[in-house]
């Protein structure tokens, strides 16, 4: 069994009040959502790699329209990088769109560039903290009940985790006042170690939980050990990442079906957010994955 050492190596709200978000509007897809990151190659600011389809420039509204009409899912994990603006007028429009179209914004994921809650410089760390405060306000205005906050990466090897924990304590307290739970995903930096994620969550105590990401492990043995640790503290959302399918139509690169078995054995009741990470056009990938997810969650 792997141990901890293995992982070490490895704003005004009133204008929004009249537009309540759609609550559990899904019919056939259960508590299945789509991460807008699945469509990252349609956004110039999040495009990377070598996409194997004809590129076009979409906005968030287009992504949600396609997901609802072609995939049959109206529940969305929004990437902060896909918000066209953080201004009130834009957010009011997104809130109204949810009401008009039956969309449900289930989670907001921080994809801000250059922020680091584990930065050594106290002044710069405080500046980064303010950016997370602003994003929590965005989640509140959109009626989103949870938000991913990345831990960042220590700039020195002997980083005192207590400093990072203190940042999360302050964010969790603020989020509680605004109806937004703080989420840590096994993403990068400190959070790449599920043991450290658990340590932070247990130290903070309230209004904080984990988001297990199926795909963000370096090896199958690490996934075998790390995923149950992440699910122990998961309540709101998990990232059901997948990399596409092989020639036999089976999920590529890792044992995805076993991830769903871990999910079920943990008695997890939150959202399952499908996230396609690959070079193909995502719509067909998500249609197929939705069918498999429904089968595995049954």
Regions found by a protein language model. Name each.
Residues 46, 75-76, 108, 165, ...:
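Acidic/histidine-rich catalytic cores of soluble enzymes
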Residues 75, 146, 237, 270-271:
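Residues at the N-termini of beta-strands
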Residues 103, 180, 266-270:
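A short helix->loop->beta-strand "cap" motif at the edges of active sites that frequently abuts
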Residues 119-120, 125, 157-161, 186-189:
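Conserved glycine-rich "GG(E/T)P / GGGxP" loop and the immediately following alpha-helix
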Residues 139-158, 178, 183-187:
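Active-site groove signature of glycoside hydrolases
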Residues 154-168:
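Active-site cleft segment of glycoside hydrolase catalytic domains centered on the general acid/base Glu
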